[in-house]
Amino acid sequence: MPHSHPALTPEQKKELSDIAHRIVAPGKGILAADESTGSIAKRLQSIGTENTEENRRFYRQLLLTADDRVNPCIGGVILFHETLYQKADDGRPFPQVIKSKGGVVGIKVDKGVVPLAGTNGETTTQGLDGLSERCAQYKKDGADFAKWRCVLKIGEHTPSALAIMENANVLARYASICQQNGIVPIVEPEILPDGDHDLKRCQYVTEKVLAAVYKALSDHHIYLEGTLLKPNMVTPGHACTQKYSHEEIAMATVTALRRTVPPAVTGVTFLSGGQSEEEASINLNAINKCPLLKPWALTFSYGRALQASALKAWGGKKENLKAAQEEYVKRALANSLACQGKYTPSGQAGAAASESLFISNHAY
């Protein structure tokens, strides 16, 4: 029998649990604004705007300084390294802006995906080297949670046992290092929506992946109450011809979570996985209305599904600032309702809100 060598003091555990609960308090979710410089380039390019540091700063400021209606909706904001050290026009560092609105500051700490040799195009995620030192510095600079993304693909022979095991272990090492530094880890094992697989296949793979992730977290002595999970919803592949209702997607998603995610986990913050803004809200709402026992907060950690309409409305023009913020506020309010099972689609979502945000083989 293994002997217990406590990884964390009671004080450390309380701090981690408190942070996790603040992020997913009722009605709150996460704004994922942690696109890498390469990823934000694609977003800016789509509106004909140059990818300069100032444009990136201005756009992030637009989101972070939206009016106080978003305060009850946004429990945390995930930033990219560059953004953590940028300032608003009034001279306040962005972390201070986020905290002044009741949000917790998060930071993306992985260094991207790399190929796993000998597999059919599968990947693992790099960034463990020097992570402890980086976490210690980020904590000093105001960040209280972190995100690390692993990616798995559904194919005829994927995900392989190797890819599942390797990614589960790298997530567990990352989580351990974060917790030692007082940072709540968001564990993100994303199963991509690419492919023609049906709902059942996605559910099966999601269950296998999550079971492996929580086995690894246990092996690495992770304090689950001080973690959040950022999974995909269980959906059919983008090329699947069969159509499913929002209720079927919700039932498959909640069932997969119930079979694999311990109730000790504080919250589940779904990624939007290229769903349209409207679809991401409707599915989140259906998940929260699903008639099964759900012991965790079930909320959002959306990037494009909170930003797409705002980005379009902004169009890279300073004079569109207010209009863009209005679009962002709309989505934040919609998702705040959805994570409480109280969202009723108005039926008048703009064209941008209903547009699929799917990017094949999506790499941040």
Swiss-Prot record:
GO BP term (any one): positive regulation of cell migration
Chain positions found as N6-acetyllysine: 42, 108, 111, 330
Residues under site feature: Alkylation inactivates the enzyme: 147, 362
Modified residues (Deamidated asparagine): 361
Modified residue annotations for N6-(2-hydroxyisobutyryl)lysine: 99, 147
Biological pathway: Carbohydrate degradation; glycolysis; D-glyceraldehyde 3-phosphate and glycerone phosphate from D-glucose: step 4/4
Catalytic residues (UniProt): 188 (proton acceptor), 230 (schiff-base intermediate with dihydroxyacetone-p)
Catalytic activity: beta-D-fructose 1,6-bisphosphate = D-glyceraldehyde 3-phosphate + dihydroxyacetone phosphate
Phosphoserine carried by residues: 36, 39, 46, 132, 272
E.C. number: 4.1.2.13
Compartments where found: Cytoplasm, Myofibril, Sarcomere, I band; Cytoplasm, Myofibril, Sarcomere, M line
Main location: cytoplasm
One cellular component (GO) term of this entry: I band
Cross-link Glycyl lysine isopeptide (Lys-Gly) (interchain with G-Cter in SUMO2) residue location(s): 42
Crosslinked positions (Glycyl lysine isopeptide (Lys-Gly) (interchain with G-Cter in SUMO1)): 42
Keywords assigned: Acetylation, Cytoplasm, Glycolysis, Hydroxylation, Isopeptide bond, Lyase, Phosphoprotein, Schiff base, Ubl conjugation
Site (Essential for substrate cleavage): 73, 108
InterPro entries to which the protein is assigned, alphabetical: Aldolase_I_AS (IPR029768), Aldolase_TIM (IPR013785), FBA_I (IPR000741)
PROSITE patterns cross-referenced by the UniProt entry: ALDOLASE_CLASS_I
Positions bound to beta-D-fructose 1,6-bisphosphate: 43, 272-274, 301, 304
Note: In vertebrates, three forms of this ubiquitous glycolytic enzyme are found, aldolase A in muscle, aldolase B in liver and aldolase C in brain. Alkylation of Arg-43 inactivates the enzyme.
Function field: Plays a key role in glycolysis and gluconeogenesis. In addition, may also function as scaffolding protein.
Protein's UniProt name: Fructose-bisphosphate aldolase A
Taxonomic source organism: Oryctolagus cuniculus (Rabbit)
